[in-house]
Amino acid sequence: MTVLKEQPPRLLRGTPLASKGLRKTFGQREVLKGIDLHIPAGQFVAIVGRSGCGKSTLLRLLAGLDQPTAGQLLAGAAPLEEAREETRLMFQDARLLPWKKVIDNVGLGLSGDWRPRALEALDAVGLADRANEWPAALSGGQKQRVALARALIHQPRLLLLDEPLGALDALTRIEMQQLIERLWRQHGFTVLLVTHDVSEAVAVADRVILIEDGEVGLDLTVDLARPRARGSHRLAALESEVLNRVLSTPGTAPEPDPVAPLPTQLRWAH
């Protein structure tokens, strides 16, 4: 596997993020209630919480798929809107076009001599040998690797992950976690991962943020060396701390279904 070429130093790669008084309402329901966050460049942040707590809404605001009712979203000192070209979003569904071969899915929307870059991105995720196959021939984990390659080809500074591993089997999920972590360490982009899996959050993130009823209920630093030994006492203790806090919070109604964006409005991992 290769590393994409011409990468600046790690700490210069990621987008620094901040939210100030971030609020979002749907009708009479306030889903986010004044979120204040500061995320340094290159940090790996996991966002957890019960269904309906507002975590997916927060990610959609960061991706520009919804607009906040109030508050600010910043990339450094500038509006986050100015960093959209350097932002990519991955979903649980890889969203590959079945009528395009793997390499063409990676290079979707690009012009010029993009094929060598697409092959390089596929090699970085271990799928260079599948470049000329159809998506239907791939497993679920392989499709998510293609989606990740589709993000890498754009050399993003901010990668937003909305439950991208939720549909994978346990072993494939761990392999994908390790791949995402390795690529993050190589390229230094900022990562925000929304997940229901507390063990996943603690295993891969620098920091775990728990959203409770639209507010930050817990902001926990995961100060453990990498690579992390799964099953270690310290990892289990941190997982238990977050999980106990999640379980102590009563469930809320599901977040409202957002209006699906048009393909031209959405920057997937492509």
UniProtKB/Swiss-Prot annotation:
Keywords: ATP-binding, Cell inner membrane, Cell membrane, Membrane, Nucleotide-binding, Translocase, Transport. ATP binds at G49, R50, S51, G52, C53, G54, K55, S56. It catalyses: ATP + H2O + aliphatic sulfonate-[sulfonate-binding protein]Side 1 = ADP + phosphate + aliphatic sulfonateSide 2 + [sulfonate-binding protein]Side 1. NCBIfam families: PRK11247.1. SUPFAM superfamilies: P-loop containing nucleoside triphosphate hydrolases (SSF52540). PANTHER family: ALIPHATIC SULFONATES IMPORT ATP-BINDING PROTEIN SSUB (PTHR42788:SF17), TAURINE IMPORT ATP-BINDING PROTEIN-RELATED (PTHR42788). It is a peripheral membrane protein. GO terms for cellular component: plasma membrane. Residues 17-238 form the ABC transporter domain. It is an enzyme of class 7 (translocase). Part of the ABC transporter complex SsuABC involved in aliphatic sulfonates import. Responsible for energy coupling to the transport system. Residues 248-270 are annotated as: Disordered. The keyword Nucleotide-binding applies. It holds the Pfam family ABC_tran. It is found in: Cell inner membrane. This is Aliphatic sulfonates import ATP-binding protein SsuB. The lineage of its organism: Bacteria, Pseudomonadati, Pseudomonadota, Gammaproteobacteria, Pseudomonadales. The complex is composed of two ATP-binding proteins (SsuB), two transmembrane proteins (SsuC) and a solute-binding protein (SsuA). Belongs to the ABC transporter superfamily. Aliphatic sulfonates importer (TC 3.A.1.17.2) family. Its EC number is 7.6.2.14. GO terms for molecular function: ATP binding; ATP hydrolysis activity.
